[in-house]
Amino acid sequence: QIADGYGYDVRALPRRNVMITSSFTGWNNYMMNLGKLMGDSDAMKRFGNTVVVWDLHSRKPKKVFDVPGAPLEIRCAWGSQNNYCFTTTALTSQIWLIYEKDNEWHTESVGTIGDPAKIPLPVDISITADDKHLWVNTWNDGMTRVFDISDPHNAKEVYTHKIGDQV
């Protein structure tokens, strides 16, 4: 598989010689008014759908993953034995796990954020220091949500709070 050419976020796990990148969208979409963007059928075709795991030292891609829906921020677990990260998708409102198992990297969708039909648009994510919870702030509905990720393969929403009309 080939990466789609968009770059957005990057995280590194130096202990695993890995760098991970997401592919939200290109500059033109990023700078466009959101209302105009959502109504522009051509612009809506210009979103990324890949996450790339790179060799950190050589800066060469090791594996390209299909992560449909425009992956945004990447956050990695803090624990020294926790070789996994999360990303969320802007257009499909999914939580994706990027994880290492038996020295191979994999991805899987592990949770849904709000009502995807309403495009909540997750814009900020954070993992708690104990790697047990993932905070997700969503732009379009002004919500903050907390997911229990003590089992990273099964994110469960445990808290929701309205912050405002838009975050």
Please give the residue ranges for each predicted region.
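Surface-exposed loop and turn segments in beta-propeller and other repeat-based domains
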Residues: 2-3, 61-70, 106-120, 159-167
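Short coil/turn segments that connect the beta-strands within blades of beta-propeller domains
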Residues: 15-17, 81-83, 130-132
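Short, conserved, GDST-rich strand-edge loop motifs in beta-rich repeat architectures
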Residues: 21-46
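Conserved beta-strand position repeated once per blade in WD40 beta-propeller domains
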Residues: 9, 73-76, 124
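Asp-box/WD-like beta-propeller blade repeats and closely related beta-sheet repeat scaffolds
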Residues: 1-14
